[in-house]
Amino acid sequence: MPNFIMMTKKSLLLAICLTTALCAMAKGNENQQLMDFGWQFIQNGKTVTVDLPHDWDIYVGPNSGKGATGTGGGWFEGGKGEYRKTFATPKGERVKLLFEGVYQHAEVFINGQKAGQHAYGYTPFTVDITPYLHHDKRQNEVVVKVDNSAQPNCRWYSGSGIYRHVWMLTMNDLHIAENGVFVTTPDVTADKAQVCVEVTVANESDRDRNVTVAVGAAQLMASVKAHDTKTVATTFFVKNPKLWSPESPELYETTAELKEAGAVVDRQTTKYGIRSFSFDAEQGFVLNGKKVLLNGACVHHDDGALGAMAFDAAEIRKVRQMKNAGFNLIRTSHNPTTRAFLDACDSIGMLVIDEAFDGWRTQKNPYDYSTVIDSCFREDLHAMVMRDRNHPSIISWSIGNEVIERKDIRVIYTARQMKAAIHEKDTTRPVTEALCAWDRDWEIYDPHAEVLDVVGYNYMIFKHASDHQRDPKRVMWQTESYPRDAFNNWAVANDNPYVVGDMVWTGLDYLGESSIGRYYYKGEREGESWTEGGFPEWHGACCGDVDITGWRKPISHYRDMLWNADEANSSLYMAVCEPDGYVGEVKLTMWGVWPTWESWTWRGWEGKPINVEVYTKSPEVKLYLNDQLVGTKQVSRDTKFKAVFNVNYQPGTLRAEAGGKSVVLSTAGEPARLRLTTDRRTIAADGQDLAFITVEVVDDKGNICPEAAIPCDISVSGAGKFMSAVSADLKDIEPYTSTRVKTWKGRAMIVVRSSRKAGQTKVSVKSSLPTASISIAQK
């Protein structure tokens, strides 16, 4: 029985106490070297020098209606590519290459000999290259062949290439195993926490070895046979522990030393966080003794304008965007994320459902994971769990999403197999899966749901009451929901402890699943993204609470208020609904919400009615137009915490007041200039850091001009280099790596990458308006 579960056949009580670690593979570890720089990329007979992370698809741009990845992949091409790099043989008895992610079907060759391969594009893998290295003065060559030509193989934008980091690991034959430190806390109170540390020692030599593992004051003796491993464990206590939580993400660290004959042969320092949590149908989700409602978002792996290229700075920014939007939970849909993303969740304070797969044995696309599942699923689950099990942010493992074969009894066997594979490496977290029904036959899932510790509901939470009556011990969370149902989903979780939370689809706009979330106008083509032929003019999904430039949509502010505000201390936000007929008669798709904007600029609509929405939990809202009272509205749960005013539009100033706060929207004048702002004025001169620069079209008073669509030309000089540019218009087919971008709704974004030298980077943007510039320091 897993150590976090006390259960009978029909009951569930999860009591989970764990502490976890940020992986010891931090930059600067003496046993590793970043291998991201100076690769030769070969494709279609052409060779260029590239630095990793690298995604060749994003450099070409969408080929609307024609790209091999289809509407699901955003009309990009996929294909094949080859990466080459030379290097000197490093010191060390054993040398390995760690690939954090290659999409997909990677083959690794060292000096012409095949050293390893890996099929799945989202899990890390390590290749021992020791037997293939030169041991004289000759340079070695690594070749990585990537095959993403079998299309379509993914329901969203995957990217193509070595899109995550590569590391060279050097070690003695006797060493702490990769991901070989595991930290848990079986007992946590406010006064004291019990911390258990397991250390796995690997002996890759031809003789038995006697070793000592030191963790704090503990000295653990062990004998490790040749070509074998041995795990030792110790326990210590932390008095008055500072508990990890989203509000207070406290981290500790401990060091494990491996010694032989008194000499230290390996050392690993691990950051960890202490906290306890439980899931229960009567109490809900309890973290450190307090009930917490889970306000979650599903997030894909792409980084928008960067495609799949997983820079640490972009991953951190993504987590921070979700934190700033009021979320406390992310579901990594539908694949393992990056180490940097999870490190950010640990340090910023964000709970995580770590998801392994989209589908299983029945294909969703002709060349998806179903083609390799039987030979790969245990390896891939182990890779995910071993790498991630020390992260305090992770509260659940997810084994799948909307599997097609749900009516086949064998699906229960598959779920059990996957759960067992996870438990081989970690029993401290519940296993979940996102279930969905495309017909009325929902109850057929009951035997499948029995396998799961927490049951994921995709768009099916309206079944919660009848399911609870049928199975009162079942713990549920809605693993996907429609953005438009924000209030109802909050209410269900707020009122029913057995429903522990909700995850909207999605937190961020993303590439692929082209046109999901769109609104359109009468006379335009109807249908959803999967309509035959797709919507070739689209290459991304606009269902996110935050758009691809990082701007929070009004639905984001509304959701944040629902989950995080109360009457005594409520946020206040005002937005304006696009009038029906302003452009055309508005039509919505399933994931769409009414086009609503932070704008009081509606030229040509003077004297006509327009709806103004104010979001707050304060009991009363007053609205003023040009300092004249328009009206007063009462706000309560009955009004879904919205005050809606119907106002005849006049240019000027619109002001809402509630709870001692006020918010103002002003009519914008003609575009006067470009305003550039950056998320950071100083970035690291390590060749890996990024600055995200927002471009806004403003009038002479600094108001954003929401209808401005102005072509801009970008130049970057100095220490850094241009990476990409983007607007939130997911119908714009300009390649993201082009130095030309057109603002949409008055906004665009530029991404600059650092070099490995100190200095200043100047970013200039030319347009029909005066040229705007901004400088960023590299240190």
Stretches found by the model and what they are:
Residues V60-T86, E93-I110, G116-A119, L169, ...:
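Active-site-adjacent substrate/metal-binding segments within catalytic domains
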Residues H134-K137, E198-D280, N648-P651, L665-G669:
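Extended acidic/polar, glycine-enriched regions
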Residues K27-L98, A150, C154-I162, L174, ...:
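Extended carbohydrate-recognition surfaces in non-catalytic/accessory domains of CAZymes
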Residues M35-F37, P53-G73, Y120-G121, P131-V197, ...:
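An acidic-aromatic loop/edge-strand motif
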Residues V197-V201, T254-E257, G592-E598, V612-Y615, ...:
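Beta-strand-rich structural segments
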Residues K27-A68, T86, V143-K145, S515, ...:
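Accessory carbohydrate-binding/adhesion or oligomerization-edge regions at the termini
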Residues A313-D566, S571-A575, V586-M590, T596-T601:
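Substrate-binding/catalytic cleft of secreted carbohydrate-active enzymes
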Residues F37, I42, G78-E178, E204-S205, ...:
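Accessory beta-strand-rich segments of carbohydrate-active enzymes
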